Curated annotation (Swiss-Prot):
Function: Plays a role in spermatogenesis. Involved in germ cell survival during meiosis. Lacks protease activity in vitro.
Organism the protein comes from: Mus musculus (Mouse)
Parts of the chain that traverse the membrane: 362-382
Biased composition (Polar residues): 56-68, 85-95
Protein name (Swiss-Prot/TrEMBL): Serine protease 43
Pfam families from the UniProt entry: Trypsin
Tissues expressed in: Testis-specific. Expressed in germ cells at the stages from late pachytene spermatocytes to spermatids.
Keywords: Cell membrane, Differentiation, Disulfide bond, Glycoprotein, GPI-anchor, Hydrolase, Lipoprotein, Membrane, Protease, Signal, Spermatogenesis, Transmembrane, Transmembrane helix
Lineage: Eukaryota, Metazoa, Chordata, Craniata, Vertebrata
Lipoprotein as UniProt keyword: yes
Annotated InterPro entries: Peptidase_S1_PA (IPR009003), Peptidase_S1_PA_chymotrypsin (IPR043504), Peptidase_S1A (IPR001314), Trypsin_dom (IPR001254), TRYPSIN_HIS (IPR018114)
Gene Ontology, cellular component aspect: plasma membrane; side of membrane
Top-level taxonomic group: Eukaryota
Signal peptide start and end residues: 1-27
Gene: Prss43
Main location: membrane
Amino acid sequence: MGGFCGADRGGFLALLVWLQLLQPLFSGTYKPREDSGVMHRPQRPRRPRSDPEAPAQQSRLKSLSISHPSGVPVSVDRTEIPGSGSPSGTTTKITLENRRSSLGGPFFTDTCGHRITEVDPGSLSAGRKWPWQVSLQSQNEHVCGGSLISHRWVLTAAHCIYEQEEYMVMLGDDMLHSESESVTLVPVQDIIFPSNFDIQTMRNDIALALLYFPVNYSSLIQPVCLPEEPFRVKNGTVCWVTGWGQQNEIDAGFASILLQEVQQRILLQKHCNTLFQRQLGTSKNLVIKGMICGLQDSGQSLCWGDSGNPLVCESDNTWTQVGIMSWGINCNGVPVLSVYTDIAEYNEWVSYVLSQASRMDPMGVLVLYLSLVFPLALLVAL
């Protein structure tokens, strides 16, 4: 009967000891450290509000049927959807239910939302004016935008993610397909989104992408702040959205090479719905709870390929992401209306996802497995 020789047993035991010693180093990736957790702008304590869509337990998906929009008079960037209609096997759903979670301590810091090198407002985005901006890519092509919120997490739109696709995240450069040494490419390990995301109405259009390994912050790569409840951006506030989407409807399928920026004026839902109804000849309210609306009067707008991009507002020299680009109509129209996922509505969900991830310990699971398997192997050898 074959077995392990003495040298083999010694090697196995040595490997097990090394894995146990290295476990804190590897497992530290997920711990909510001050420099690795999602970052929120500090807010004065306020009375919590009742949130009908706080998160619950997560579960692994094998398939989830999501059909393309039908009968909804909005543009949903079909040209950038790479899949056939259901999330991949590496996609996790998290149900939004009437439950709240608390996440405090190191996750809430004030080191986010800052530029290392300032650039004049209104110029093209050279020089990493927006260091949290990332490109979500598939098969070396830009699919959607996103924003870095921690060393290992990227925020984007749920409708960008479809099955049988391997995703990469590009950070550190404003040029797509740049060969600069500043470019960082990181594969995506997992993508998490609300189980009740509805592509018909674009409700709950938010997703979190987990990078395979953490990225280091620099003058080219910085996280953006997220709003804390009950933060609400005021009507008329001037904010900015950035992205590599095509610049007009004529250039279908061609992303901009250089990162673009567009100024947005925040509109109340009621006013936004009135403008949509007037343009589309409908009585339906298309902008619903969980969405915010931006207006650009000049005709410069976002277009296909801009989904998932961050809408950011500045206050006290700190940039906070208030929205995720979700949908809009008529790239070349005036005025241009764009609709964003309201991040403040999903603050608890984001915090819950990251708090659950912080409890994961893949290296610990491996050590446990080896601790069980190796003694059995040694017994067999003996």
